[in-house]
Amino acid sequence: MMAADDTMSSKRADNCYKKDRGTMVYTPTDAQQATGKVHEKVYKFFESLYWMYYIHLPYYLMTSFDSFCLHVFFLVVFTLSLFGLLKWVLSLYWATVGYMAYAATGQ
């Protein structure tokens, strides 16, 4: 029961502090919180890809068949690019494994 009383008193203290200092709560922006790690860069890339694909392409000016063809074209290009990247990474992996096997066994 004591913990609940402490929680309530801290909430009251926060409310009093907010009333004295104003009601605005500082929240850092995404740019301020960014650390520059790889997963943030990948997320930013896919976010920009989304904005380019769904927002900037003028589907609303096209007929439904034209927009369908353009949509299919971009999906095919993206899929083939992803396939090529995957094949390249796998070839590097198998080349490395083959080299390591040769270095370890000499055969």
UniProtKB/Swiss-Prot annotation:
What role is this protein assigned? Stimulates the activity of serine palmitoyltransferase (SPT).
Q: What is its main location?
A: endoplasmic reticulum
A biological process (GO) of this protein is: 3-keto-sphinganine metabolic process
Q: How does it sit in the membrane?
A: Single-pass membrane protein
Instruction: State whether keyword Transmembrane applies.
Output: yes
Subcellular locations according to the entry: Endoplasmic reticulum membrane
Q: Does the keyword Cell inner membrane apply?
A: no
The superkingdom listed in its UniProt entry is Eukaryota
The UniProt gene name for this protein comes to: TSC3
Question: Can you name this protein?
Answer: Serine palmitoyltransferase-regulating protein TSC3
Name the source organism: Eremothecium gossypii (strain ATCC 10895 / CBS 109.51 / FGSC 9923 / NRRL Y-1056)
TM region positions: 72-92
